[in-house]
Amino acid sequence: MISIRRARLSDASGIAAVHVATWRSAYANVLPEDYLASLSISRLASFYEHGIRLGLGLHVAASYGERAAPPILGFSSAVRCREGRLGEGEVETLYVLDDFRDRGLGEQLLLASAKHLTQLGCRSAFAWVLSENPSRYFYQHLGGKQIASGTTWVGGEDIPQIAFAWDPIETLLDVNA
């Protein structure tokens, strides 16, 4: 059984493991190889543990009783934006292990993040996605409209990225209804 729920402190290592595995898979030919090799589960676990303690909007796809399945299969995070130029809320992360993709977990995690943002009072949402990430079509499929482009500094390089938005946020909630 798989459930989508708020992250707990005990999930931090599992979230970090998903982060490392998905980045090394999805960004193998996008981000610098040495940067991907340097990703540390223990360092990221501390980062996510801190976020969970602060009550940030971290959600997980957790497996219970699934044979040979890791305890955390995917995760998402969402926060209220300080400046709100692109939207009032940002889906900062959304990652699902390769072996568990195409099962609706990404949609469920994105919906959990959108619901969290509405609870914070956000009326719109956006997500930055690396331009060469094949999953960018997932956001379009769920009604995201490309609204901006730019770069982000990762591993000593400027990496192109694009922003998808749902304004109003109900356009995302309705797609998942």
For each predicted feature, which ranges?
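Structural motif
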Residues: V18, L120, H141-L142
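Conserved GNAT acetyl-CoA-binding A-motif
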Residues: L117-W128
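Acetyl-CoA-dependent GNAT
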Residues: R6-A12, A17-R101, E107-A112, H116, ...
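Short phosphate-binding/catalytic loops that engage adenosine nucleotides
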Residues: L105, C122, G144
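Residue-level preference for beta-strand/loop junctions
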Residues: P70, G87, G121, D158-P160
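C-terminal "cap" of GNAT-fold acetyltransferases
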Residues: F126-R136, Q140-K145, S149-A177
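Extreme N-terminal starter segment of soluble prokaryotic enzymes
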Residues: M1-S3
